[in-house]
């Protein structure tokens, strides 16, 4: 046992210090990024925000809606091959280039992933997603996927420390997913005591990844557009959002009614709700590590996305970043004891 004395920070612990800017308008800010990925060699340009691979966020409907904003969607792994085939036939190539195919790490997952990718050459992104990216089995699966899919962009995670980011990149990941426990419906930290404050994880993992020519995605911890800006400011190449995109028409979630008001269920993918739906229940040897919440219906996701992108552009103008790529170079974080005036409530 040992204790690390360094204080680790989450998004709520800091603000971005404003700096002199030559920008006259938020409209001058370029949010599009261009990447050429380490292993696949593929190039991609777009707004580097990703809808999370949760079954009530990363849906086909969400992918179609977000593609119009040049934003990615990690489509959840629970669609059938037949549903994928119908989707691929229905949507244009401009949507498919914004889609990540999510997979677990079982042999059945591997076979299904290959079958989905074979449906269209336009499917170029793979998202290998497990709660604990520190297992040898996960690394072996990543290596197997890289060997089988040399020309696809592979995003793999989740981890929170630099040495594991390096191992995953050296094992074939183009992008490493960073975050353990920060999600809005994740209870891993309280069930297990394991985790890492998200901003510090992003800063440290970005440093490790960029040294090897890889990228990271900050997964979890964002509750307001300002948190998205902080993640990019901390060095994230991509930011994955779950709760901020939940509850919309495109989420295809379960709608319940209470006292005449309608709500949409939103739950973590390690929650009892998710395990009952997809694997028949919580196994006797494990605990649920997610919760279920009821969200008021939020309408079309378009308006939320515009709010997020608008906040991100505004953050760039406050520090003089003409392009999103420049935000991390222009960011100075200050530690704070408060974030906002709550006289009339939060946000």
Swiss-Prot record:
Keyword field contains Protein biosynthesis: no
Q: Tell me which CDD domains the record gives.
A: IMPDH (cd00381)
| InterPro entries linked | Aldolase_TIM, GMP_reductase, GMPR, IMP_DH/GMP_Rdtase_CS, IMP_DH_GMPRt
GO terms, molecular function = GMP reductase activity; metal ion binding
What the entry lists under Pfam families is as follows: IMPDH
Where does the chain bind K(+)? 181, 183
Q: Can you tell me which residues form the catalytic site?
A: 186
Note whether Flavoprotein occurs among the keywords: no
Q: Which family does the entry's similarity section mention?
A: Belongs to the IMPDH/GMPR family. GuaC type 1 subfamily.
Q: What is the protein's given name?
A: GMP reductase
Organism annotation: Serratia proteamaculans (strain 568)
